[in-house]
Amino acid sequence: MSQKPHLNLIVIGHVDHGKSTLVGRLLMDRGFLDEKTIKEAEEAAKKLGKESEKYAFLLDRLKEERERGVTINLTFMRFETKKFFFTIIDAPGHRDFVKNMITGASQADAAILVVSAKKGEYEAGMSAEGQTREHIILAKTMGINQVIVAVNKMDLTDPPYDEKRFKEIVDQVGKFMKSFGFDMNKVKFVPVVAPTGENITQRSENMKWYTGPTLEEYLDQLEIPPKPVDKPLRIPIQEVYSISGVGVVPVGRVETGVLKVGDKVVFMPVGKVGEVRSIETHHTKIEKAEPGDNIGFNVRGVEKKDIKRGDVAGSLNVPPTVADEFTAQIIVIWHPTAVSVGYTPVVHIHTASVACRITELTSKIDPKTGKEVEKNPQFLKSGDSAIVKMKPIKELVVEKFREFPALGRFAMRDMGKTVGVGVVIDVKPKKVEIK
């Protein structure tokens, strides 16, 4: 493991805007890829006559390996800059990308938003159905404030490398982000060409008009979020493995608090208690884990069948909250008709996904000011923001957003789409026996 400070990065943006190529380029220039993997990807791309897509092939290759090789550590994609050690926590292009973005974004310290400057592509991303808009809204709701906007495909503008087009995109995307409450001092824009690496790790000869930092230099300007080590322990579980000769190994990211070898932890909602025998991160044994660490930890006293993805490990004296009902502020992103009381979408929160029924529409609010505009509305439609009450259909750990951000923000999914996103304001706890 690198001794540099570690940041988790998510790469977002509309389909076909060049996310994979950009990630591949970063990994190739600054990453942990060996020549062999790169060569194989180049050959695979050549065979299919898609030379320019070798980076995307590279990612597919890595993804396959990740899906095949079940190891304790979460072998995310990693690269280093002068200042930081980065983990890319989701390679885009995934069917479940929005859902992953919500469960994954709870882990991201910053985002690279890839926006194509090509005529037609940029407009598609910013249309009502476009993922550029959707991902911007999601990033904000999920608490990602640091965003680097990589305006890609600058070689395909008309004329090529057009400064005017770049400025137009900066202006429009900037206005949109500002309207959703982004602090624009933490949002940076850089014109890039992903396949050639222009303005990614090296300066572009073709865009002399741009004198700002490269993407890599902007990555080095990111700020490290403070570690919430003083809060009670919370580790949402991503996977649970049973490893011969070791025992039960839950895997997850420490969101708050500190986990030490020898600690007793409780898994909620089941209420089972286990003792931590060892902790690993990226194949390295460690004595204690802090917020931001992706770990596998071996526990004694718990069986594999007792715990599952979506459970949360926490401290015994302040155990994770199991919700009987919770109050949330939501934004309806997309719904074909309207959302009313009784509507039951699947709520994706931290690593869990559980259907939750809306039991009350308390008030409709202005998303930009947060002020109430209507009491007890009959229904909500796309674009509306509201305070609602929700009841999980089965046991679910939910925390207040202001106390445990990663366990208090969620997405609502239905019909294969993200219907809305929200943050938890209050929780009515359910009594769970700790055994």
Swiss-Prot record:
Record GO terms (molecular function): GTP binding; GTPase activity; translation elongation factor activity
Domain tr-type G: 4-229
Chain segments carrying region G3: 90-93
Residue span of region G4: 152-155
Residue span of region G5: 193-195
Annotated keywords: Cytoplasm, Elongation factor, GTP-binding, Hydrolase, Magnesium, Metal-binding, Nucleotide-binding, Protein biosynthesis
Range of residues in the leader sequence: none
Region listing for G2, in residue ranges: 69-73
UniProt: Mg(2+) binding residues: 20
EC number(s) recorded for this UniProt protein: 3.6.5.3
Role according to the record: GTP hydrolase that promotes the GTP-dependent binding of aminoacyl-tRNA to the A-site of ribosomes during protein biosynthesis.
Name the UniProt record assigns to this protein: Elongation factor 1-alpha
Species per Swiss-Prot/TrEMBL record: Sulfurisphaera tokodaii (strain DSM 16993 / JCM 10545 / NBRC 100140 / 7)
